[in-house]
Amino acid sequence: MGAYTYVSELWRKKQSDVMRFLQRVRCWEYRQLPSIVRVTRPTRPDKARRLGYKAKQGYVVYRVRVKRGGRKRPVPKGIVYGKPTNQGVTQLKFQRTKRSVAEERAGRKLGGLRVLNSYWINEDSTYKYFEVILVDQAHAAIRNDPRINWICNPVHKHRELRGLTSAGKKYRGLRGRGHLHNKAPPSRRANWKRNQTLSLPRYR
């Protein structure tokens, strides 16, 4: 077995004494640093490589801190409108994953880079930490690499904001295949619109 097999096995056994200690120490360090910070190399090299990372020019990794918990509805001055059944503020569930939020924040802060993928690295009672892999689409090493230069196409600008990354497709419900998943694509909204539209074809 290769080295990455052992590394991934370490990360599978997160409750071992060594990993518990390591994760607690790392979490303390992450809390002292800004919410978005660049890291010199991935914390989980096996996971990063599986998701497309290469240790070459043009690839960068950023660690992003996201607050845990539900999403509170923004109601200015506490004014809610509509019927009482729809006036909830606090018990609402955000429809997107924390990982997709981390990708969005990294993509907004680093507008000149393209978000490739992301993965979980740590969490405590208050925050979750993710590492986001970004690609510099203007770098010659990226533009000349046939395995990654697809991301240089302008249609991939801010793919993280449009639910086109792996995390985005997951919260959109596009992971499944087959007859049990024919309501999810192309989107939940499109499916709702199709079902609500009355079609009256003219007979000739």
Curated annotation (Swiss-Prot):
Family annotation (Pfam families): Ribosomal_L15e
Entry-linked NCBIfam families: PRK04243.1
Keywords (A to Z) from UniProt: Ribonucleoprotein, Ribosomal protein
Protein name listed in UniProt: Large ribosomal subunit protein eL15
Protein family per UniProt: Belongs to the eukaryotic ribosomal protein eL15 family.
Basic residues composition bias: residue spans: 172-182
GO MF annotation terms: mRNA binding; structural constituent of ribosome
